[in-house]
Design a protein with these regions (language model features):
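Acidic/polar, glycine-anchored loop/turn motif associated with catalytic or activation segments
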Residues: 1-247, 254-312
Length: 312
């Protein structure tokens, strides 16, 4: 029989009778900036579910491995049950967002060819504030089991009220993983984690060093069989409507059969898209980040994106 549901910020994962499958239910919620910005929008779940189903159907048509099985109803779909890999896989055609924060001299009309591939860890790094020159304290994060004067991991769960015991630490969410560009990381099998939203100084020490969560062969597969093909298929679909796919993120996981697949969701929260290549015409969630009070604009944008993806 089905067990307990797993509820996150924007979706609920429900077990069903088939132990190999789950039902993914989208909530009428948008969040941004590590859930500092949150809004309820009636009907947004239906739009996001339609977008995800349209995208995964497109990927399956191009033989890209995905967890997606079928749409269930207006705000849910059925997918293979996966053990998620705790990394966020980002593909960039153009610089934006955290890339500009790490590379303030970059220009917006720069193009990455080949695509720029980045990995971020899904856990936060918690560092005693005295160790960092540039603090980044996120007071909405719940940090568990923090030893005194030690670097520690924690899931980036949100809480309505910050714990005062966290006031002496800096919390770096979704740290950037460095392994390809770092000879030591390759030689020793260590991943180095750096702040995702700060420039790197010369000889800067990483926030933390960890044992890799997947091996070199898996990273190669994720890059070349999941990340690049996924981006290129979706990029070509958007090009038909003269919409630029600037960047996007995906998550991956292992099915119960051990297959590594694109999983979770891909919807208007997952990318930046600019009609006519113009950032002022953005249709994605960046509009919500920039002006969270203009929910009617955000709602219309999501409806427009659904209409586009219906034609993919």
């Amino acid at each position: 029989m089905p067990n307990e549901d797993i509820e996150g910020k924007t979706k609920i994962i429900q077990e069903i009778e088939d132990p190999n499958l789950v039902r993914i239910v989208t909530k009428n919620v948008l969040t941004a900036n590590d859930a500092e910005i949150k809004a309820s929008i009636s009907g947004i779940a239906d739009e996001k579910t339609a977008q995800t189903c349209n995208i995964f159907k497109l990927l399956k048509q191009h033989n890209i491995p995905t967890a997606y099985q079928s749409r269930n109803d207006n705000n849910s779909f059925i997918a293979k049950k996966c053990k998620m890999v705790p990394i966020e896989c980002v593909i960039r055609r153009r610089p934006y967002g955290s890339y500009f924060k790490r590379h303030p001299d970059a220009v917006v009309d720069q193009t990455f060819d080949p695509l720029l591939l980045e990995f971020y860890h899904k856990h936060a790094v918690v560092v005693p504030r005295i160790q960092r020159r540039v603090p980044r304290y996120k007071n909405n994060l719940q940090i568990q089991h923090l030893p005194e004067n030690e670097i520690k991991w924690s899931d980036t769960n949100t809480t309505d009220s910050p714990d005062p015991s966290f006031s002496g630490v800096d919390i770096f969410t979704d740290p950037l993983i460095e392994f390809d560009q770092n000879p030591e990381a390759i030689a020793t099998g260590v991943w180095h984690l750096y702040p995702a939203k700060q420039p790197r100084t010369a000889n800067q020490e990483p926030l933390h060093k960890i044992v890799p969560v997947v091996g070199d062969e898996e990273i190669y597969f994720i890059k070349n069989s999941l990340m690049i093909p996924t981006f290129e298929v979706i990029e070509n679909a958007w090009k038909k409507f003269n919409v630029t796919l600037v960047d996007m993120k995906i998550e991956v996981g292992y099915t119960r059969d051990g297959e590594l697949v694109v999983s979770d969701v891909i919807d208007n929260d997952s990318w930046r898209i600019w009609p006519n290549g113009d950032p002022k015409q953005q249709l994605d969630k960046q509009a919500f980040r920039d002006a969270p009070s203009k929910l009617s604009v955000v709602e219309e944008n999501y409806k427009t994106v659904t209409q586009y993806t219906n034609k993919f």
